[in-house]
């Protein structure tokens, strides 16, 4: 069995006890370190540090303490070793530095299966494509065209592995060759979700792609983990593209997170009569996303400097930034 450092074992335990993306975890680790953060959970009588809001700190500890179990870290370590997953930590080898932009909401660690070079590439070499699970034929078609052409540039296609737009993006990227796509999972890597896409995930790894997750092995997805994953999808890439999304699609949250991080956001327009494109139209209407219809426009969106009209667009964006920020907050609710 592989030997994991005490630091790594504590991170494994904390990821199992706390929900991903909770800023209280990040604030505590930054203020008092990993060991003392775990001690706060184990000792309900210990004082909450001044680095966090007292009420939030108490709620955080209560939720984490309720998840404690015997040999929890050992179980996670054993599954990590059994499946030969890579365990990555901030600042360590293979860590995607783009995630550091998340600050206190950055993951404590990641599990990875596949080609690690896709993680060490710059954010500008990756494009997140996500959208409707119940995709229409139109949505699948434009997704396939975008993903194939972007992968050929080349750009690494990042998505969440869901049905519909996500799966279409992964499959299209695979047609261009190896090392073309990355799956960001909301469940442990040994618990593929959705299960019917397990074969797709295996194919991605075989073709030098990669799967990653901040959820420990042995644990399934949850609503909170799907929501938290949105920030990873947004932060990993230089741009987020929504080919098709309804007004209530979870992919709008990815777009909002990307906008908040200062990443480029694009959306593909659809038929005005189609409810399946209402979310894309909202993103464009509220100034969160630029209109994109082809890979070249996505590349321009990520690096506008070579194009003569870019400065004018940037001035307009700066003038409209306050309204855009409010729109992003509404999408995140």
Protein language model features and the residues they cover:
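Glycine-biased, small-residue-rich flexible motifs in mid-sequence functional cores and linkers
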Residues: 1-8, 19, 89-333
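Short, small/acidic-rich helices and loops at N termini and domain boundaries
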Residues: 1-94
């Amino acid at each position: 069995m592989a030997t994991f450092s005490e630091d790594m074992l504590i991170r494994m335990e904390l990821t199992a006890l706390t929900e991903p993306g909770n800023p209280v975890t990040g604030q505590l680790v930054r203020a008092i370190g990993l060991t003392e953060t775990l001690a706060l959970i184990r000792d309900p009588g210990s004082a909450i540090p001044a680095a966090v809001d007292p009420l939030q700190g108490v709620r955080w500890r209560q939720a984490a303490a309720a998840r404690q179990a015997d040999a929890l870290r050992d179980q996670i370590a054993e599954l990590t070793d059994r499946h030969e997953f890579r365990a990555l930590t901030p600042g360590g080898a293979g860590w995607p530095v783009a995630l550091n932009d998340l600050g206190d909401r950055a993951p404590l660690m990641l599990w990875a299966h596949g080609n690690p070079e896709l993680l060490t590439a710059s954010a500008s070499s990756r494009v997140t494509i996500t959208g409707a699970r119940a995709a229409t034929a139109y949505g699948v078609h434009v997704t396939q065209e975008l993903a194939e052409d972007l992968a050929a540039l080349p750009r690494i296609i990042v998505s969440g592995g869901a049905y519909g737009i996500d799966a279409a993006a992964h499959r299209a990227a695979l047609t261009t060759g190896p090392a073309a796509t990355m799956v960001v999972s909301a469940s442990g890597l040994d618990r593929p979700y959705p299960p019917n896409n397990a074969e797709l995930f295996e194919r991605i790894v075989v073709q030098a792609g990669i799967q990653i997750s901040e959820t420990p092995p042995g644990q399934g997805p949850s609503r909170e983990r799907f929501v938290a994953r949105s920030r990873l999808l947004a932060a990993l890439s230089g741009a987020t593209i929504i080919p098709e999304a309804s007004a209530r699609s979870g992919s709008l949250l990815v777009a909002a997170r990307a906008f908040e991080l200062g990443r480029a956001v694009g959306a593909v327009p659809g038929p005005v009569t189609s409810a399946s494109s209402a979310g894309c139209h909202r993103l464009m209407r509220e100034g969160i996303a630029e209109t994109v219809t082809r890979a070249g426009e996505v590349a321009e969106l990520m690096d506008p400097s070579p194009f003569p009209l870019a400065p004018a667009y940037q001035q307009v964006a700066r003038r409209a930034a306050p309204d855009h920020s409010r729109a992003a907050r509404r999408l995140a609710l």
